[in-house]
Amino acid sequence: MKCVVSRADDLKRMLDLSDVPTKSQGEQDAGVLILLHDDGSEKLKVLLCVRSRQLRRHPGEVCFPGGMMDDEDGQNVRRTAIREAYEEVGVNENDDYLVLGNLPAFRARFGVLIHPTVALLRRPPTFVLSIGEVESIFWIPLSQFLEDTHHSTFLIDEFYMVHVFQFDEYPTTYGVTALMCIVVAIGLLGKLPNFNLMGNLTISDMLDKHLDSIEIIRHVYEFASRKFEPKSKI
């Protein structure tokens, strides 16, 4: 346990996490759990889900365990993430993982404000998938989200850059899920991506300004929750 706590403190510092969950905006709020696994192989991994193809919204897409805030969550988005992760994949906060803190909120294209809670696995859990919500789950090394080998982008409304990772060994991951994975990878691995991160944060920008990982992810945080207004590229 001491080793887990020590590692957790390191990860929290590297991601500049907050002890206080981001606040509900009183609109469309969702909580997700970014669950990390450090197996000692020097390949820090993150858990991702493939949504059930029976769902009406975003069937078959890759996402983090999580969902929309309910009244029972008491306007606490961390509770939302913890509850949804248990309902969807069967992981329990008390037994399976240690909460590290929260990232700032990220806004999805259709207005949902996603509040990520970051956690570190304590032990290998026994996953129990909610068949109606989750088709499958997979662990993927964070390093995959910094390489340009399987990476591409496209623009929405001519201004919003969407990252796409079409892996050979893993399901295709894109959108706000991919962006959050990139941010976590930059912070925890201390490396720059081999591609432009945003329209206003290119490889040249990052290198010319000698930005470190914390400066880069703080730049992303600054823009991540903004509403979609096609005036400036992000």
Curated annotation (Swiss-Prot):
Mg(2+) binds at E84, E88. GO terms for molecular function: coenzyme A diphosphatase activity; hydroxymethylglutaryl-CoA hydrolase activity; metal ion binding; succinyl-CoA hydrolase activity. Residues 27-162 form the Nudix hydrolase domain. One of its GO terms (cellular component) is intracellular organelle. The keyword Amino-acid biosynthesis does not apply. It is found in: Peroxisome membrane. The keyword Protein biosynthesis does not apply. Pfam families: NUDIX. Its cofactor is Mg(2+); Mn(2+). This is Peroxisomal coenzyme A diphosphatase ndx-8. It comes from Caenorhabditis elegans.
